[in-house]
Amino acid sequence: MISYSPFWRTLRAKNITTYALITRHNISSATIDRIKKGKGITTTKLDDFCRILQCSISDIVEYVPDEK
């Protein structure tokens, strides 16, 4: 499964709020909500986050194997 835990750590490390992403960078609140709920987002949005946060994709998402 894909985890967005790195996304939240990166936001904290860079002192950027979700409000700033929405108001300054035109990220929709629906996209933030999808991330909060662990749902999928597009590769375009992943690219946007990497550009905005000046980070790599591993700072946004990580793969966590299912425990089955």
Language model: regions and residue ranges:
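Short alpha-helical DNA-recognition segment
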Residues: 15-33
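Short, basic-rich loop-to-helix N-cap that marks the start of a DNA-contacting helix
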Residues: 39-51
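Short C-terminal boundary/hinge segments that cap the last helix of small helical domains
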Residues: 54-68
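A short, Lys/Arg-rich alpha-helix, primarily the initiator
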Residues: 1-20
